[in-house]
């Protein structure tokens, strides 16, 4: 995660190491400052980003996740990650993602986005197995990533065929897609 913040006056003269220590002292324990980059005045990590990447984790199975319980969606059932990944490939490229965003947020706004990469794979972290949905794109609409995940879960659980993703994309209507995955 990258953030940008303005630095003024005497702070500009501080070394990067000193600034990192100062910021670390001011932040909560669950935030870790790892690196500092000096950027031109007016730079915004949000608006000047060329790409954004997200990882959404799902714990599929009857056992709740132990370590990831507060940042993983526990889905009590089986999911076919290979089918989910196959369907996900239809979303790579430039498309109108209106079906995958909160309907009210799409009114009168452009909904075309470019997804550079979208993969679904089984992973293991700290001894627990998860399904990771990794997506990289130029920008995302409101709830777009979570709605993509919810739609892929419908396919992974066998309730919809892989080809359904094409219908959802073509519909350009939020009602056509699966439910929005929970915030994690």
Predicted regions and their residues:
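Structured-RNA-binding interfaces characteristic of tRNA pseudouridine synthases
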Residues: 1-184
């Amino acid at each position: 995660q990258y953030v940008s913040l303005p630095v003024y006056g005497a702070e500009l003269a501080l070394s990067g190491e000193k600034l990192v220590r100062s910021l670390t002292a001011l932040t909560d324990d669950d935030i870790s400052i790892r690196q500092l980059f000096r950027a031109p005045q007016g730079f915004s990590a949000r608006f000047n980003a060329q790409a954004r990447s997200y990882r959404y984790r799902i714990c599929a199975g009857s056992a709740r996740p132990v370590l990831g319980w507060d940042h993983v969606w526990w889905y009590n059932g089986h999911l076919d990650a290979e089918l989910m990944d196959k369907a996900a490939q239809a979303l790579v490229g430039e498309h109108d993602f209106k079906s995958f965003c909160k309907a009210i947020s799409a009114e009168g706004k452009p909904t075309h986005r470019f997804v550079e990469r979208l993969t679904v794979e089984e992973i293991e972290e700290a001894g627990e197995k998860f399904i990771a949905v990794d997506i990289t794109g130029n920008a995302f609409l409101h709830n777009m990533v979570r709605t993509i995940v919810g739609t892929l879960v419908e396919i992974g659980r066998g309730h919809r065929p892989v080809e359904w993703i094409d219908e959802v994309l073509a519909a350009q209507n939020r009602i056509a897609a699966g439910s929005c995955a929970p915030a994690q």
